[in-house]
Curated annotation (Swiss-Prot):
Organism expressing this protein natively: Aliivibrio salmonicida (strain LFI1238)
Span list, region Large ATPase domain (RuvB-L): 4-186
Domain observations: Has 3 domains, the large (RuvB-L) and small ATPase (RuvB-S) domains and the C-terminal head (RuvB-H) domain. The head domain binds DNA, while the ATPase domains jointly bind ATP, ADP or are empty depending on the state of the subunit in the translocation cycle. During a single DNA translocation step the structure of each domain remains the same, but their relative positions change.
GO cellular component: cytoplasm; Holliday junction resolvase complex
InterPro entries noted in UniProt: AAA+_ATPase, AAA_lid_4, DNA_helicase_Holl-junc_RuvB, P-loop_NTPase, RuvB-like_N, RuvB_C, WH-like_DNA-bd_sf, WH_DNA-bd_sf
Binding-site positions, DNA: 315, 320
SUPFAM superfamilies with a match to the protein in the record: P-loop containing nucleoside triphosphate hydrolases, Winged helix' DNA-binding domain
Molecular-function GO terms, alphabetical: ATP binding; ATP hydrolysis activity; four-way junction DNA binding; four-way junction helicase activity
Region (Small ATPAse domain (RuvB-S)): 187-257
Protein name as annotated: Holliday junction branch migration complex subunit RuvB
Location relative to the cell: Cytoplasm
Family under the similarity heading: Belongs to the RuvB family.
């Protein structure tokens, strides 16, 4: 699938081998969690209140586009609360017993973090309801007429769920989270701070303007910013003296085919296809997918969100429409309609 090869795809599995570096440069405390000020200020109060009452933090749901720091925030909460965190994901929990095993091994006030929580199976989700509300497990023993239900008490714990699709959560599950936080795309100055901090953690020689160049093209996403930084580092090591100046950063990013707006090949292909083949739209998703040879889910979940958020593309009841801003970006005159 083309999406898997995109350097700027925030959830690109090709770069899983670099997660060790990612963990090394992730912030560990709320004071270092830059760019989500409303989330940080609220979580500081919620965490301090829970500590004052010597209670577990209320269950927390974190949602937003890929790469904005949902897992990072979950680990920060665990560090701030001074508790252990167990991490899993929705697709991994196939049977009720999988979740029951995790829950029964939690210590008091521990955190259970479930990534992609919207992908939990209905059977597993049913187990969560009494666990979240009453700290109890309801388990069926036996089958048929001889079946009986037993209750197992659980230590007080905090469930943190992360998802890119909050709308896909069932209402009963969503309503059981006492705290809900949405992560937004980052501003350029916050991303510049993150890039510079990551460069310092990696002992890189980098000018502030070089960090700014990377931040401008990172699509408002820290994960992409850090990935681009590593590729710029490679370029600087080979093509210069390892020092990252604005000029080196610009040349490296141009080599990577990431333009000044953060668009890569697939972004440009989608926008140009709508402009050149469909006169700017409106055009349906099926036609767009056929025109660029990409899957519909990839277009909706990976390519389009940033283009829409930045005002280059619109989703309407009649289909996709390219905005005047996109025509201006490519230097193309909008056709008269």
């Amino acid at each position: 699938m083309i999406e898997a090869d995109r350097l700027i795809a925030a959830d690109n599995p090709v770069f899983r081998d670099e997660e060790v570096i990612d963990r090394a440069i992730r912030p560990k405390k709320l004071e270092d969690y830059r760019g989500q000020d409303h989330v940080r200020s609220q979580m500081e109060i919620f965490i301090k209140a829970a500590q004052m009452r010597q209670e577990p933090l209320d269950h927390l749901l974190i949602f937003g586009p890929p790469g904005l720091g949902k897992t990072t925030l979950a680990n920060i909460v665990a560090n701030e609360m001074g508790v252990s965190i167990r991490t899993t994901s929705g697709p991994v929990l196939e049977k009720a017993g999988d979740l029951a095993a995790l829950l029964t091994n939690l210590e008091e006030n521990d955190i259970l973090f479930i990534d992609e929580i919207h992908r939990l199976s209905p059977v597993v989700e049913e187990i969560l309801y009494p666990a979240m509300e009453d700290y109890q497990l309801d388990i069926m023993i036996g089958e048929g007429p001889a079946a009986r239900s037993i209750k197992i008490d659980l230590p007080p714990f905090t469930l943190i769920g992360a998802t890119t699709r909050a709308g896909s959560l069932t209402s009963p599950l969503r309503d059981r989270f006492g705290i809900v936080q949405r992560l937004e795309y980052y501003k350029v100055d916050d991303l510049q701070y993150i890039v510079q901090r990551s460069a310092d953690c990696l002992n890189l020689s980098m000018e502030s303007e070089g960090a700014l160049e990377v931040a401008r093209r990172a699509r408002g996403t820290p994960r992409i910013a850090n990935r681009l930084l590593r590729r710029v580092r490679d370029y600087a090591d080979v093509m210069s003296d390892s020092h990252i100046s604005p000029d080196i950063a610009d040349k490296a990013l141009n080599m990577l085919d990431v333009d000044v707006c953060g668009f890569d090949y697939m972004d440009r292909k989608l926008l140009l296809a709508i402009m050149e083949k469909f006169n700017g739209g409106p055009v349906g998703l099926d036609n767009v997918a056929a025109a660029i040879g990409e899957e519909k889910d990839t277009i909706e979940d990976v390519i389009e969100p940033y283009l829409i958020q930045q005002g280059y593309l619109q989703r309407t009841p009649r289909g996709r429409i390219v905005s005047d801003r996109a025509y201006l970006h490519f230097g193309i005159d909008r056709p008269d309609k």
